[in-house]
């Protein structure tokens, strides 16, 4: 923990970059090892829990939980459109039907891993990276946090997840839009908890998507709908944030 604190005090941005690198390497390694062991997400979950516990402990020891969004939202449900866009986003994963894509054990491991992923990615990209960069330039921080979150998903091409090029590129597009949306949610609420829950649920529902979602047209349709929903919600929240700042 002392080494983490030393790096954090020296440069919050490089601290964020170090976490991004560690996250990408360990989670990708976990996926590869899980495939070798023959149990989906078995090793990935262990790595995800380890990273989550280390990060939580670091934030708690240094009294940084609220500074990085682990606190109650300060926005009303009405100002967030009662999170209806998030519900619509979650429904996209199920629009082609519902089926069990893994065995019972693997489904449980997959769901738990996806909530670890949601937690880690929100804290790392929104809490750490965006939080560090916004001190210098808010607009640059929004752009970088959104783009790095989207582009970071291209690692699925080589981590053993089985994603093909087209599917992965489509994922990068809507992940960038989702990254923008989550940043705007964080800015409006001062909390990452709603982002973590929505992110984790969206990822977890992938374990139940219907067969049509894997077809070329299904992938394109899903990507377009997700990009439209997340972009529209992000733009609405951006205007809401600007309006509130102008009245303060």
Where are these regions (language model features)?
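Aromatic-anchored segments of alpha-helical transmembrane domains
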Residues: 20-29, 87-96, 115, 147-155, ...
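Functionally important transmembrane alpha-helices
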Residues: 168-220
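Alpha-helical transmembrane segments in multi-pass membrane proteins
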Residues: 10-59, 84, 108-109, 220-231
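Hydrophobic alpha-helical transmembrane segments
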Residues: 13-18, 79-84, 108-111, 139-144, ...
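C-terminal membrane module of polytopic membrane proteins
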Residues: 200-248
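N-terminal membrane topogenic signal
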Residues: 1-19, 76-77, 191
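Membrane-interface helix/loop boundary segments of multi-pass membrane proteins
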Residues: 120-146, 187-191
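Juxtamembrane helix-loop-helix connectors linking adjacent transmembrane helices
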Residues: 4, 32-43, 59-123, 130, ...
């Amino acid at each position: 923990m002392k080494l983490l604190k030393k790096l954090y005090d020296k440069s919050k941005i490089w601290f964020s970059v170090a976490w991004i690198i560690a996250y990408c390497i360990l989670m990708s390694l976990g996926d590869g090892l899980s495939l070798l062991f023959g149990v989906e997400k078995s090793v990935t979950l262990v790595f995800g829990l380890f990273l989550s516990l280390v990060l939580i402990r670091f934030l708690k020891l240094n009294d940084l939980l609220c500074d990085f969004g682990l606190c109650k939202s300060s926005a009303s449900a009405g100002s967030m459109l009662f999170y209806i866009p998030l519900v619509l986003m979650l429904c996209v994963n199920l629009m082609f039907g519902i089926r069990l894509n893994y065995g019972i054990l693997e489904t449980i491991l997959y769901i738990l891993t996806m909530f670890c992923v949601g937690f880690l990615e929100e804290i790392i990209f929104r809490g750490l990276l965006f939080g560090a960069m916004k001190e210098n330039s808010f607009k640059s921080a929004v752009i970088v946090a959104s783009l790095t979150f989207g582009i970071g998903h291209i690692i699925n091409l080589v981590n053993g997840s089985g994603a093909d090029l087209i599917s992965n590129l489509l994922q990068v597009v809507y992940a960038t839009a989702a990254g923008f949306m989550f940043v705007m949610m964080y800015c409006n609420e001062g909390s990452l908890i709603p982002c973590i829950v929505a992110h984790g649920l969206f990822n977890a529902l992938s374990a139940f998507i219907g067969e049509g979602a894997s077809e070329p047209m299904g992938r394109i349709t899903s990507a377009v709908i997700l990009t439209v929903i997340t972009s529209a919600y992000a733009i609405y929240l951006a205007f809401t944030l600007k309006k509130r700042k102008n009245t303060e």
